Amino acid sequence: MLSIMLAIVFVLFVLIYLIISIKNHHPFLHRIETLIQDFNNTLLFGAYVQIYDLSTPARTERLFIIAPENVVLYNFNKTLYYYLDSANVFCPNEFSVTTFTQSTIKTINETGIYATACTPVSSLTLIEHFATLKNNVPDHTLVLDVVDQQIQFSILDIINYLIYNGYVDLLAE
C-alpha cells in the first residue's frame, strides 16, 4: 500500500514538473512573447501630424497629414475638411469630405449627424499641391504620444486637439 502511495506521489510530482517545464520552456514561447512585445510597442507610438501652411493674412489655408492612418485634413477659410476613405459610396466619381465649421460642430454635438459634401478635388491633389509649394517639407510636425496621454488616439480626438490648440482656424472674425 505504501509503495502505491509513493508511486502516485511520484507520478503527480513528475506531472507537475512536466506542466511547469512545458509552460516555461514552450517551443513557441519566445515567438509568442516577441509578437506580444511588438504589438505593445506599436500601441505606444501614437501619431504625428505634418502641417503645411500656405496661409495669408486674408485667409487660412493649411493641410494636415495624420500618420500612420494617412488621414488628410484641409483647413480653408474657417472650414475644416476631413477626407473620407469611403469616397465612392457617397459620391460616385467624386471624393467625400466631412466639413467642420462652428455651426456644424454644434449640430454634431446636438444630433450626432455629420455634414458631408462631395468634391472633385482629391486628397492626393491637395498633398501634391502643398508638397510642391513647400518642397515636401512641412512647416510643423506634431508628435502626439500615447504614453504622455496627449491623445486617446482616435481621429476625432486629434481633430479636437488641433482645434483646441489653435492649429485649425474655425473662428469667425
UniProtKB/Swiss-Prot annotation:
Its main location: virion. It holds the Pfam family Baculo_19. Coiled coil: none annotated. GO terms for cellular component: host cell cytoplasm; host cell nucleus; membrane; virion membrane. It is found in: Virion membrane; Host cytoplasm; Host nucleus. It comes from the Viruses. Residues 1-21 form the signal peptide. InterPro entries: AcMNPV_PIF-4. Keywords: Host cytoplasm, Host nucleus, Membrane, Signal, Virion. Per os factor that plays an essential role in the initiation of host midgut infection. May form a specific complex with PIF1, PIF2 and P74 to bind host receptors. Belongs to the baculoviridae 19 kDa protein family. This is Per os infectivity factor 4. The lineage of its organism: Viruses, Viruses incertae sedis, Naldaviricetes, Lefavirales, Baculoviridae.
